[in-house]
Amino acid sequence: MKMTFRHYGPGDPVTLEQISQIPVIRSVVSAVYDVPAGGVWSRESIRAVKDAAAAHHLGFEVVESVPVPEEIKLGAPGANVLIDHYCENLRRLGEAGVKCVCYNFMPVFDWLRSEMEHQAPDGSNSLAYDEKTVLSMNPLVGELSLPGWDESYTKEQLRGLLHQYESVDEEKLWGNLRTFLEAVIPVAHEAGVNMAIHPDDPPWGIFGLPRIITNEKNLKRFLKLVDMPENGLTFCTGSLGADPDNDLVAMAEEFAPRIHFAHVRNILRTGERQFHEVAHPTECGSLDIYGIVKALHKGGFDGYMRPDHGRMIWGERGRYGYGLYDRALGAMYLSGLWEAIVKSECGK
């Protein structure tokens, strides 16, 4: 297992120097953030990310993410050209030494939350989701003031995009995903890059949009679309764990050989389709983080891991979910679990 830490480039309030001071971190997860979805990343821009990390003795082996344009998800005209661009990005990333690319196939919204600063009794704050609040902000009937909307879309553009998806049900989305994978996975194989799809967050349909990377059954179906080792998963415990029907411990062990990237975080479920994010340790939330990490090890996981969304603590301000302090605590906690599990297993 290789512990990593996400960094959002030069504009990130968390600096590479700070990340390099977290004892267990040897590599950053980053991307080229100034090229729109569907564009081709220049070799120079990829090299700049790698060189910036190397200046602080950090590697750059995981990209999160190379966004999949909506035209590909829709199966719209021009999708083939954009798939070609995606393949070229994989070739260039492989040339630069990148080993894993995290991406998602969520229509329109990468993720949704109803509150960005949910206050805890101890004074910390975190991201929260309440289905009733989210549905009250339906873009087809109301104002778009909900945290998490993609600000690159105007209200009119967003409504238009949602209208296009009215003809895309789950099976059509599965078909478009297959088309994408059949093109990119062989290229990823040649480039030495593992592809790791991120689950839908949250793992259920929103505003009539289909969501398909949601549970054990669908993860099995996904892996069979193109049954090659490079076609793998990002195992995000917080995303999948929002649905109490998902047995994360069992899934972690089952899918471990095809999990190339693990996002490990805890959430506290407070009602039906209602949760907020908490500190990483098991005792803080609804997820058995120890059990999940142990299951990953038992299943043979040998990929990249990172602490996921953290709380804002100790007065820190910055990018929601991506402050320094709580994620650093999470990295140390997860690394401690892993070390203890490895050494206890070796001692048997």
PLM regions and their residue ranges:
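Active-site-proximal, glycine-rich beta->alpha crossover segments in alpha/beta enzymes
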Residues: 92-96, 100-178
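Glycine-rich, positively charged N-terminal anion/phosphate-binding segment
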Residues: 22, 40-61
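N-terminal ordered "arm"
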Residues: 13-16, 22-35
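A short glycine/small-residue-enriched secondary-structure motif
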Residues: 21, 58-73
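Histidine-acidic metal/acid-base catalytic patches
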Residues: 1-18, 51-54, 71-75, 83-84, ...
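Acidic, His- and aromatic-enriched active-site or binding-groove loops in soluble protein domains
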Residues: 88, 120-144, 215-228, 327-331
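Glycine-rich, proline-tolerant flexible connector loops at the mouths of alpha/beta enzymes
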Residues: 31-47, 207
